[in-house]
Design a protein with these regions (language model features):
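Structural signature of WD-repeat beta-propellers
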Residues: 125-126, 155, 164, 171-172, ...
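WD40 beta-propeller blade core
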Residues: 131, 177, 217, 262, ...
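Extracytoplasmic beta-rich repeat domains
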Residues: 96-115, 143-161, 187-203, 226-248, ...
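Blade/loop signatures of beta-propeller domains
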Residues: 34-52, 58-95, 271
Length: 444
């Protein structure tokens, strides 16, 4: 086993789990009749207090109406990671609760967000077992162990993506693996020489995957052949996990753990532009950890990306010119809906910003400590996602919250037996949560 793989076990992990969610009406809260105007590890960047812009006072946020979302074929939804405003039922109730396999432990970490395609739900547990389930009732269809015999099971993996009847997996043993979605049969394997901690992105019969050494591979979806590669700056230290590439309009945007953000032509890997979201600040314990762990978004010709180093920026997809930037750091993926962005900061603030101007409209401080008086028990949050006029986040203390996207007001919350580290997903009017102990719960 490579030294990189061995070292990955030494990273600190959060031992948290999601249990059965109850009281869904309370959790979702009461829908407002009229909108009002308006981390995982101890060395995450700490920021100064963020406040709404004075020029934003009295601004009324207007969002597009929620629409049905049939599939969630890769981490972050679709290849561009722009999911906007999705619909879920008004009175969610638990439909089923299943185990997908092995969860997180001292040596293993559950990393893969579930994906949904063609009425099937696909998961990968911490031991690289990929399974397919019926999304309507949670019944297992097939299960496939893809770890080679010569490798250990306790490796930290990447994630999943679906396209053209195939499920693609990035793994901790340095292989991208393609499986037949109907049967789980392995179709091809491609050795990329280093572990992967982020999910692949599949678009146009190409599969894009980033290794922990900051090397981007573009593979042929049918054969696994290497079409081209691109190398970023290799980092000695980075955060656990990583951002998946975003693909749209013939461009792939690669987020590297160095804080680099690089745009390349999908066809041949030609570099169009490069930027850095390192955002080094004096006195920070993580000035060298500029990792872009949240997935970048491509939406209507603009790239939105946030780094742990304290930079949140909007960049022109074609030219690489910055449109706006904010000194906000985070490791969770931003969420875009209409003309607004919602993002969780490293300081546990949930923030609403303007898509075109970066103006801050509201800031809601989420609970930061289990024991606020003694500042003990740091709470981490995952999300947000936007569904039926509610921003949904989940935390390491076993609490999920819904907040108004119009003003940040808390609409509802529910106590759960354990916590959540993987952002929930929405497909077929269902809201799905995956716990650290590998329990998957569906609400519809």
């Amino acid at each position: 086993m490579s030294q990189i793989m061995k070292n990955s076990r030494l990273l600190m992990m959060l031992v948290i789990a999601l249990g059965v969610l109850t009281g869904c009406d309370t959790f979702l809260g009461t829908k407002e009749a009229k909108p009002l105007p308006g981390k995982r590890i101890s060395i995450l960047t700490q920021q100064r207090s963020i406040e709404p812009d004075a020029s934003a006072l009295g601004h009324k946020i207007v969002l597009p109406a929620p629409v049905p979302n049939e599939d969630w074929p890769q981490a972050g939804g679709y290849a561009n990671h722009a999911m906007h405003h999705m619909r879920v039922g008004k009175a969610l109730q638990e439909r089923w609760n299943i185990s997908i396999g092995q969860g997180s432990s001292d040596e293993e970490r559950l990393m893969a967000q579930p994906i949904v395609a063609e009425d099937r739900l696909y998961t990968m547990d911490s031991e690289t077992v990929i399974s397919a389930f019926n999304i309507k009732n949670g019944d297992e269809i097939w299960s496939s162990e893809i770890t080679p015999k010569e490798e250990d099971d306790d490796l930290i993996n990447g994630g999943l993506a679906y396209e053209n009847g195939k499920v693609f997996a990035t793994t901790g043993f340095g292989q991208v693996v393609a499986l037949e979605a109907k049967s789980g049969k392995v179709l091809w394997r491609r050795n990329v020489g280093a572990p992967m901690r982020s999910a692949p992105t599949a678009r146009g019969n190409r599969v894009f995957a980033i290794t922990v050494t900051n090397k981007l591979f573009a593979l042929h979806g049918q054969t696994g052949a290497v079409l081209w590669t691109h190398s970023g700056i290799e980092e000695v230290t980075n955060l656990l996990g990583g951002g998946s590439p975003a693909v749209d309009s013939g461009v792939v945007v690669a987020p590297y753990s160095s804080g680099e953000l690089v745009a390349l032509k999908v066809e041949n890997g030609q570099e169009l532009w490069a930027d850095s979201l390192s955002g080094v600040r004096r006195g920070s314990a993580s000035t060298t950890l500029s990792t872009i762990r949240g997935r970048p978004i491509i939406d209507r010709g603009i790239v939105f990306a946030i780094s742990n180093g304290g930079q949140f920026a909007a960049i022109n997809l074609r030219t690489g010119r910055r449109i706006w930037e904010r000194p906000i750091g985070g490791i969770e993926s931003p969420w875009i809906a209409g003309e607004y962005l919602f993002v969780l900061s490293n300081n546990t603030d949930l923030i609403a910003l303007g898509r075109l101007n970066g103006r801050i409209y509201w800031v809601t401080a989420l609970p930061k400590w289990e024991d606020p008086e003694d500042r003990e028990g740091k709470i981490t949050w995952t999300g947000p996602i936007l569904a039926s006029d509610r921003l949904i986040v989940a935390g390491s203390t076993g609490e999920a919250m819904s907040l108004s996207p119009y003003n940040g007001r808390t609409l509802g919350k529910v106590d759960m037996p354990d916590g959540v580290t993987i952002s929930p997903i929405v497909a077929k009017d269902s809201l799905l949560f995956l716990s650290e102990d590998a329990e998957l719960v569906s609400y519809r």
